[in-house]
UniProtKB/Swiss-Prot annotation:
The keyword Signal does not apply. InterPro entries: ATP_F1_dsu/esu_C_sf (IPR036794), ATP_synth_F1_dsu/esu (IPR001469), ATP_synth_F1_dsu/esu_N (IPR020546), ATP_synth_F1_esu_C (IPR020547), ATPsynth_dsu/esu_N (IPR036771). Belongs to the ATPase epsilon chain family. Signal peptide: none annotated. This is ATP synthase epsilon chain. CDD domains: F1-ATPase_delta (cd12152). GO terms for cellular component: plasma membrane; proton-transporting ATP synthase complex. NCBIfam families: ATP_synt_epsi, PRK00571.1-4, PRK13442.1. It comes from Hahella chejuensis (strain KCTC 2396). Keywords: ATP synthesis, Cell inner membrane, Cell membrane, CF(1), Hydrogen ion transport, Ion transport, Membrane, Transport.
Length: 141
């Protein structure tokens, strides 16, 4: 059993994960982060995307967060997100449809067009698809 740190992944609706992990990998606002026990305390914004955790014993689990914050304390990693879900529970068809709708909104700018909202929706849909792809790659191993 390797050295571990406690990790909580919490959405506005519920706690998604709570347990000991050897590593947390997440998409921070300044790039990807790899958090291991003993990491320097940190508070950063998260981009929409996958959060991978390596549990004790090497088992990996993947989650999707729509953004939020990651906080690292000496013995604790906390991820707070508006919305989070296990990657295995994601619907690829819905993610593809959301991506198409966002691309269509960007292409057909109307009078009350909100570019930032459409771009944000496109980024989130693309991140959902990346998370699904990571999950597939994990299952192939």
């Amino acid at each position: 059993m390797g050295i571990s740190v406690h990790c909580d992944i919490v959405s506005a609706e519920q706690e998604i994960f709570s347990g000991l992990v050897e590593m947390v990998i997440a998409a921070g606002s300044e790039g990807d982060l790899g958090i291991t026990p003993g990491h320097t305390p940190l508070l950063t914004a998260l981009n929409p995307g996958p959060v991978r955790i390596i549990k004790q014993g090497g088992e990996e689990e993947v989650f999707f967060v729509t953004g939020g914050f990651l906080e690292v304390q000496p013995n604790m990693v906390t991820i707070l997100s508006d919305s989070a879900q296990r990657a295995g529970d994601m619907d690829e068809a819905a993610a593809l449809e959301a991506k198409k709708e966002a691309e269509k909104a960007l292409a057909n700018r109307g009078g009350d067009f909100e570019y930032s909202r459409a771009a944000s929706q496109l980024a989130e849909a693309a991140a959902r698809l990346r998370t699904i792809q990571q999950m597939r790659n994990k299952l192939k191993r």
